[in-house]
Design a protein with these regions (language model features):
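Active-site-proximal betaalpha loop/short-helix elements
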Residues: 85
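Short acidic-hydrophobic catalytic motif
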Residues: 1-82, 91-94, 100-104, 109-134, ...
Length: 232
């Protein structure tokens, strides 16, 4: 079944889920319950209602991660040269996503090593088993045309390939490199991931945002579902 067909068969939203547009409209009971739980510094918190999927959702910004059990909450992010890793424990119906900007550089969620530690630890605290984890990898696009000698996306992809191999976490699907920015959606309970390559017109805006964040970082003190990829 295509994603569009799946959307057509999706059940209508219950009255409590017919939320307003934008982040401020989220008032469902499940989101209130999630917000009431203790949160880590780098855990995503931009909740909204996704009208296309008729689900509550949380959008990950650079440096953030999120873990959830079940498919009642959609995890989403938009990537340029950044990389997002989705880790899934199907037996536990548990999954999570992160979004990192650079391979290494300190103890912050925007750096790959720490981003992976946050995600793996978050999953294991919720009952995941390390030996059951599977990975889906997205992003690393060459969207920053002014970077002729250093391709940040390639560096990010090379890092995560090496990291997952060293940790013996199998990669069951991936959509990386190329020149396109991407939107990624994860249904954490089933592990189903959707990826949409965005138009070239959107690449410059995403690249500018990433460049601005990287510029700020350079001035800051260093701190210590099966394997197929579905398009939508």
């Amino acid at each position: 079944m295509t994603p569009l067909a799946a959307l057509a068969k999706a059940p209508p939203a219950r009255p409590s889920e017919r939320l307003g547009t934008g982040l401020a409209g989220v008032t469902s009971e499940r989101v209130r319950a999630i917000k009431a739980q203790p949160r880590s510094e780098y855990e995503a918190h931009a909740f909204y209602h996704d009208a296309a999927f008729r689900l509550d959702a949380v959008k990950l910004m650079p440096g953030e991660y999120f873990v959830h059990d079940g498919d009642d909450l959609l995890l989403t992010t938009v990537l340029g040269s950044c990389v997002s890793v989705c880790l899934i424990d199907r037996a536990a119906h548990l999954g999570g996503m992160n979004h990192f900007m650079l391979p290494d550089g300190g103890s912050a969620g925007r750096y790959g090593v720490y981003a992976m530690e946050l995600l793996i630890n978050g999953l294991m605290k919720r009952g995941a088993r390390r030996e059951r984890l599977q990975a889906k990898v997205f992003g690393g696009g060459h969207v920053m045309s002014n970077f002729s000698t250093i391709n940040v996306g390639e560096q990010n992809v090379a890092f995560i390939d090496q990291f997952l191999a060293s940790e013996r976490i199998p990669v069951v699907s991936r959509d990386v490199l190329d020149i396109h920015p991407r939107k990624v959606c994860l249904f954490p309970g089933s592990g189903r991931a959707l990826v949409k390559k965005l138009a070239a017109a959107q690449a410059s805006g995403i690249a500018s945002q990433e460049a601005a964040v990287r510029g700020a970082l350079s001035k800051a003190p260093a701190q210590s579902a099966a394997g197929s990829v579905e398009l939508f």
